[in-house]
Amino acid sequence: MARNEVRPVIKLRSTAGTGYTYVTRKNRRNDPDRMVLRKYDPVARRHVDFREER
């Protein structure tokens, strides 16, 4: 079905350089560009930007 095409699984990698990642899904129709979310990085022990990695 179209489930895999509309809401793919993506990795969000920390920009702090710790290598920590979150795994989530996104809607390609609403967010066609690469996602950037501000989330908690437990390795750096602070909130940092997480960028989508393909």
Curated annotation (Swiss-Prot):
Annotated GO MF terms: structural constituent of ribosome
Query: Which key words are in the record?
Result: Ribonucleoprotein, Ribosomal protein
- GO terms classed as biological process: translation
Bilayer-spanning residue ranges = none
Q: Which GO terms describe its cellular component?
A: cytosolic large ribosomal subunit
Which Gene3D superfamilies does this chain map to? Answer: Ribosomal protein L33
Read off the SUPFAM superfamilies from this record: Zn-binding ribosomal proteins
- Entry's InterPro entries? Ribosomal_bL33, Ribosomal_bL33_CS, Ribosomal_bL33_sf, Ribosomal_zn-bd
Q: Which NCBIfam families match?
A: PRK00595.1, rpmG_bact
In the record, the note on similarity to other proteins reads: Belongs to the bacterial ribosomal protein bL33 family.
Q: Which HAMAP family match?
A: Ribosomal_bL33 (MF_00294)
Can you say what this protein is called?
Answer: Large ribosomal subunit protein bL33A
Q: What is the source species? A: Streptomyces griseus subsp. griseus (strain JCM 4626 / CBS 651.72 / NBRC 13350 / KCC S-0626 / ISP 5235)
What's the source species' lineage? Bacteria, Bacillati, Actinomycetota, Actinomycetes, Kitasatosporales
